[in-house]
């Protein structure tokens, strides 16, 4: 079960990141303030990161790198700490920021600015804590 969910988490991450990047680009390219295309991409990106979060939380509780590694000894190893603490915490914060950006954009007169700022910060946070050594192998 663990390898299957790990594969889903790894492959779906590409889709989630792509949708966030497309949302940011479509927001930048939006010239007409009344256009709704950037909002659609922002919504798809929002849904993708939330699905990725659910898959990731499932993986966290099934993984040998999850709750079992919250002891003092595992915190000394940078890779184990990345998987057990830094990756989940930072990604949850990034998803919260993306959610805030989408929700604020619905209330703002020019929502594209909110999406641009919050989605970009969220993307930077997501990319900063990807375990690149295992993800690309």
Roles of regions detected by a PLM:
Residues 1-137:
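Membrane-embedded alpha-helical bundles that constitute the cytochrome b-like, heme-associated redox core
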């Amino acid at each position: 079960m663990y390898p299957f969910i790990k594969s889903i988490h790894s492959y779906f991450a590409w889709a989630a990141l792509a949708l966030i990047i497309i949302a940011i680009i479509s927001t930048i390219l939006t010239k007409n303030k009344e256009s709704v295309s950037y909002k659609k991409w922002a919504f798809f990106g929002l849904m993708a990161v939330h699905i990725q979060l659910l898959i990731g939380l499932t993986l966290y509780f099934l993984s040998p790198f999850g709750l079992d590694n919250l002891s003092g000894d595992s915190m000394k190893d940078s890779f184990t700490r990345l998987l057990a603490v830094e990756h989940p915490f930072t990604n949850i914060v990034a998803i919260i920021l993306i959610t805030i950006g989408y929700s604020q954009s619905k209330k703002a007169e020019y929502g594209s600015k909110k999406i641009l700022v919050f989605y970009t910060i969220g993307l930077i946070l997501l990319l900063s804590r990807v375990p690149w050594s295992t993800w690309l192998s």
